[in-house]
């Protein structure tokens, strides 16, 4: 049974001690229908198609709200050299702050920790990775201010940057003899409790009991504090804003670029605002936005050339939303190639997902799966026209990506790994299509054994490695092909978040039952109880994800580990308020703030 922590955890998280399958094997609703005349092949062994009327589903997604001409018209003055020079001057000033005399750092490590935290939340810490690493190396073993706030902030930042700082030794003075957290009477009580709350989300699976206690303890306090603040209307509006934001979703789970945009506004009105940091954050945000605009325009031109958005009127035409995902995964300007190629992969995944979920018949889907597994452009004559379009767009794009790796790195072995990932993806889609067509409802475990693949994260992450690694190595490709924890656990959370945000809409249009419905069918609980259970699983699996950051082989670059973490954060961002991928209105304001409107 799930622990009854719903009242003490944020909206996006509750917790229970449950297990999800971590093996890598792949193994009745009435939808709206439309009638379409289409040639259909009867089986993979039949080459001659047969004309007949096919009853097809329709999801009625609607056209994109972002026209090609509008995207191509995007422009920014922040591409200019004058802003680049301004940015460099500001970076020099901030770098000097981080490189203060060692005696100052030793005397006041809290000041440096707060500076690092602000740089991270403002979205500019990527400029100062070396300086931050040197500072944390010095601070790591230094005694810190004994307050809960100072201890918790240090713990969170060290864990955030990969230091395995011990939890019990850090917080022992704030625990009773049973190891439970206890209240103190310090003046920074709320500030300290908020810091402890945020720090708890970086705990790992072996620390789950401390996690449960810390979240229960801090959440109850913070909710009571907010309620009292709203009644008394005291002066600490800045702290109250931070607390409410954290209770909605903890910092560790948030999409970094949107968090930066939000925090820039909040920081500007804060009591300790540093004008140099603020100016740096604004200028950098606008310069990076200009880079993202050019990336988006590139992907939009590619998408138009494929013709998939126009020809596949049953599928989601969501080039902007697909690009949004990639910015959540890796926003730094130097990774434009990864963003562009990953957005192309996302567009292909979205179209093919809709082929399996919405439009294709089971016979057609078996043909398409077989074609992808064969990876032979000469054997597609038996496919209907819309599937030929999908296959050749996929085939040409992936082969082009392989060619670029060959040209730039003299590495010619990545295509077999990429095509196998796509074949596994289509096989997992086919499993769900068979479940839907037979009316079968799997157990939650059986569903998850397939669904962590069908959610597309393994394909996305394998491509992301190929787009960022230099050099690309056979050892890494073999390692990733076996679905290590960093991929499998990331995919688990993406799937569960996806199901929380989209399952109701998908069932209405006709789709396989998701994790919520599988658990309801298996246990007989209500939908609310099932959703609470899924939130519990997300919290548990996040702790496994925190563990999976460590212990990876050296041939996996740090940037790839970051993408795997950020993919999870992006899923929580995209599905926090429903289906942000399929329902464009749920994402519109965020797209405007990230890609269209500069910060004044």
Swiss-Prot record:
Q: Which residues are noted in the entry as Mg(2+) 2-binding?
A: 353, 357
According to the record, the protein's activity is controlled as follows: Inhibited by 100 mM KCl.
- What's the record's pH-dependence note? Optimum pH is 7.0.
Annotated coiled-coil segments of the chain: none
- What stretch of residues is annotated with the motif DDXXD motif? 353-357
Task: Report the main location listed first in the record.
Answer: plastid
Q: Does the UniProt entry include the keyword rRNA-binding? A: no
CDD domains in the record, alphabetically? Answer: Terpene_cyclase_plant_C1
Which molecular function terms from Gene Ontology are attached?
Answer: gamma-terpinene synthase activity; magnesium ion binding; terpene synthase activity
Disulfide bond positions: none
The cofactors named for this UniProt entry are: Mn(2+); Mg(2+)
According to its UniProt entry, the protein's GO biological process terms are: diterpenoid biosynthetic process; geranyl diphosphate metabolic process
Identify the Gene3D superfamilies for this entry. Answer: Farnesyl Diphosphate Synthase, Terpene synthase, N-terminal domain
Question: What pathway, per the record?
Answer: Secondary metabolite biosynthesis; terpenoid biosynthesis
Q: Where does Mg(2+) 1 bind?
A: 353, 357
Keyword vocabulary terms for this entry: Chloroplast, Lyase, Magnesium, Manganese, Metal-binding, Plastid, Transit peptide
Keyword Chloroplast appears in the UniProt entry: yes
Cofactor binding note from Swiss-Prot or TrEMBL: Manganese > magnesium.
Check the record and name the InterPro entries matching this protein.
Answer: Isoprenoid_synthase_dom_sf, Terpene_cyclase-like_1_C, Terpene_cyclase_plant_C1, Terpene_synth_N, Terpene_synth_N_sf, Terpene_synthase-like, Terpene_synthase_metal-bd, Terpenoid_cyclase/PrenylTrfase
What family classification does the UniProt entry report for this protein? Belongs to the terpene synthase family.
What information about domains appears in the record's comments?
A: The Asp-Asp-Xaa-Xaa-Asp/Glu (DDXXD/E) motif is important for the catalytic activity, presumably through binding to Mg(2+).
Instruction: Give the protein's biological function.
Output: Monoterpene synthase which catalyzes the conversion of geranyl diphosphate to gamma-terpinene and the minor products limonene, alpha-pinene, beta-pinene, alpha-terpinolene, alpha-thujene, alpha-terpinene, myrcene and sabinene.
Q: What is this protein called?
A: Gamma-terpinene synthase, chloroplastic
């Amino acid at each position: 049974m799930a622990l009854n922590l719903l009242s003490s955890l944020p909206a996006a998280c509750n917790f229970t001690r449950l297990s999800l399958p971590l093996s890598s094997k792949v193994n009745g609703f009435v939808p709206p229908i439309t009638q379409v005349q289409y040639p259909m092949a009867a089986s993979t062994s039949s080459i001659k198609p047969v004309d007949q009327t096919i009853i097809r589903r329709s999801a009625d997604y609607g056209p994109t709200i972002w026209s090609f001409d509008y995207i191509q018209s995007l422009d920014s003055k922040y591409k200019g050299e004058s802003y680049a020079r301004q940015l460099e001057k500001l970076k020099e000033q901030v770098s000097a702050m981080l490189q203060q005399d060692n005696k100052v750092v030793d005397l006041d490590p809290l000041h440096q920790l707060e500076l690092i935290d602000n740089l991270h939340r403002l979205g500019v810490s990527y400029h100062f990775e070396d300086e931050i690493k040197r500072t944390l190396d010095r601070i790591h073993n230094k005694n810190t201010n004994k307050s809960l706030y100072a201890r918790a902030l240090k713990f969170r930042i060290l864990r955030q940057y990969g230091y395995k700082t011990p939890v019990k030794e850090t917080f022992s003075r704030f625990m009773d003899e049973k190891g439970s957290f206890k209240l103190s009477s310090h003046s920074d009580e709320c500030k300290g409790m908020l810091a402890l709350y945020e720090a708890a989300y970086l705990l790992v699976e072996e620390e789950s009991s401390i996690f449960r206690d810390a979240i229960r303890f801090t959440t109850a306090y913070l909710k009571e504090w907010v309620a009292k603040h709203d009644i008394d209307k005291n002066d600490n509006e800045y702290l109250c804003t931070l607390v409410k934001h954290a209770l909605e979703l903890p910092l560790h789970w948030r999409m970094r670029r949107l968090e930066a945009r939000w925090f820039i506004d909040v920081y500007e009105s804060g009591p300790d605002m540093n004008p140099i940091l603020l100016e740096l954050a604004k200028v950098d945000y606008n310069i990076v936005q200009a880079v993202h605009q050019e990336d988006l325009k590139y992907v939009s031109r590619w998408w138009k050339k494929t013709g998939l958005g126009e020809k596949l009127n049953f599928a989601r035409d969501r080039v902007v939303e697909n690009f949004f995902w990639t910015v959540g995964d890796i926003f730094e300007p130097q990774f434009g190639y990864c963003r562009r190629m990953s957005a192309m992969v996302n567009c292909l995944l979205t179209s093919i997902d809709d082929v399996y979920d919405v439009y294709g018949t089971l016979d057609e889907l078996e043909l398409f799966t077989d074609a992808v597994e064969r990876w032979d452009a000469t054997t597609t004559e038996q496919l209907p026209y819309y599937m030929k379009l999908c296959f050749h767009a996929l085939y040409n794009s992936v082969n082009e990506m392989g060619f670029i790796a060959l040209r730039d790195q003299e590495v010619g072995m990545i295509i077999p790994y990429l095509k196998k990932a796509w074949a596994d993806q289509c096989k997992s889609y086919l499993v769900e299509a068979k479940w839907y067509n037979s009316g079968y409802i799997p157990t939650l475990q059986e569903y998850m054994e397939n669904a962590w693949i069908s959610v597309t994260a393994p394909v996305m992450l394998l491509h992301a490695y190929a787009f960022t690694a230099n050099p690309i190595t056979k050892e890494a490709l073999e390692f990733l092909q076996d679905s290590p924890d960093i991929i499998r656990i990331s995919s688990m959370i993406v799937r569960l978040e996806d199901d929380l945000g989209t399952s109701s809409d998908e069932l209405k249009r006709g789709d396989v039952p998701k994790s919520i419905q599988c658990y309801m069918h298996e246990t007989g609980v209500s939908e609310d109880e099932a959703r609470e259970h899924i939130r519990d699983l997300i919290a548990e699996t996040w702790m496994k994800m925190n563990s999976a950051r460590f212990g990876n082989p050296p041939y996996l670059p740090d940037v790839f580990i970051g993408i795997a973490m950020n993919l999870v954060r992006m899923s929580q961002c995209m599905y926090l308020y429903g289906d942000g991928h399929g329902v464009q209105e749920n994402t519109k304001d965020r797209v405007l703030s990230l890609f269209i409107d500069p910060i004044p």
